[in-house]
């Protein structure tokens, strides 16, 4: 198939009730600290990042991992002066500055390690990251930050579920690109699409599934995570997916320059 492994890892310890317990176990084991301001792992800790870097480097080498989804960074700055990081400054910027510098160093050394083996590495940063193009020196994609994993617009009554989902995501793009005017290339956006899974509670005909996939491809992103439940797929949907991926790859040199024109989709405006 020509495929390789990827790794989905939450630096802060995930997003569940177990997150504080993970952080406490890491602190008890001497491998990092609990950030009591956000009740998760302190992602600015020097010892934690040293241990994490070793784990990621060793794991990427052993399993030839070429994709890293690093999901969840700093929800709140850690203000504990007893930890192995600095604190203070306006809006806790001393901590924030040192924390991100340590992450930049981690990204740099991790890429150098993979380069020695002539291996590529796609790094995807998700939650609690400023979506600045500056990050693209070190990572490949950044999550939108302004949306839910999945959502449905309520701009029209009794509209098809697929249209509500498409409009929701497009309205988040409008907010990102137009309202907030974030100067971020479409090709490097991670948008959570396509989602067609059991927990999403969506049900599309083959025609709707095709519309959903190709519409998403036209947003211009270079990277898709396929959140698909196999039991919801039939032979036609698998063929549609394959056709979309081939088309998206063949036309990426055009699609990567996608721009949003028109008004806010959630306000029933014409757009493209």
Q: Where would I find each of the regions flagged by the language model?
A:
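Generic structural signal for hydrophobic
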Residues: 1, 59-60, 216
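Active-site groove signature of glycoside hydrolases
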Residues: 53-86
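Loop/turn elements at helix/coil->beta-strand transitions in domains of secreted/extracellular proteins
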Residues: 2-5, 63-66, 118-121
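Glycan-recognition surfaces
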Residues: 14-50, 54, 100-232
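Glycine-rich tight-turn/loop motif centered on a GG-T
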Residues: 1, 84-99
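Carbohydrate-binding surface patches
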Residues: 261-272
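Hydrophobic faces of well-ordered beta-strands that scaffold small-molecule active sites
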Residues: 5-9, 68-70, 123-125, 223-226
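Contiguous C-terminal substrate-recognition/catalytic subdomains in enzyme active sites
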Residues: 231-239
């Amino acid at each position: 198939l020509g495929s390789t492994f990827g790794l989905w890892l939450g630096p802060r310890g995930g997003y569940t009730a177990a997150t504080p317990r993970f952080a406490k176990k890491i602190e008890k084991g001497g491998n990092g600290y609990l950030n009591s301001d956000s009740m998760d792992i302190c992602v600015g800790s020097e010892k934690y990042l040293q241990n994490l870097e070793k784990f990621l480097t060793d794991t990427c080498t052993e399993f030839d991992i070429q994709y890293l989804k690093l999901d969840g960074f700093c929800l709140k700055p850690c203000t504990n002066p007893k930890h192995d990081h600095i604190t203070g400054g306006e809006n806790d910027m001393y901590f924030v500055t040192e924390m991100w510098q340590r992450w930049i160093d981690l990204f740099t050394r991790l890429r150098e390690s993979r380069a020695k083996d002539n291996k590529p590495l796609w790094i995807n940063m998700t939650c609690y990251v400023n979506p600045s193009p500056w990050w693209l020196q070190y990572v490949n994609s950044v999550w939108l930050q302004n949306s839910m994993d999945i959502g449905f617009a309520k701009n029209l009554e009794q509209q098809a579920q697929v249209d509500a989902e498409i409009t929701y995501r497009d309205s988040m793009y409008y907010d990102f690109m137009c309202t907030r005017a974030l100067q971020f290339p479409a090709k490097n956006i991670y948008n959570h699409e396509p989602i067609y899974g059991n927990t999403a509670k969506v049900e599309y005909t083959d025609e709707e599934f095709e519309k959903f996939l190709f519409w998403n491809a036209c947003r211009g992103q270079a990277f898709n995570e396929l959140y698909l439940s196999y039991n919801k797929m039939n032979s036609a949907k698998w063929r549609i997916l394959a056709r979309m991926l081939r088309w998206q790859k063949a036309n990426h040199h055009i699609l990567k320059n996608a721009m949003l024109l028109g008004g806010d989709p959630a306000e029933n405006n014409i757009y493209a």
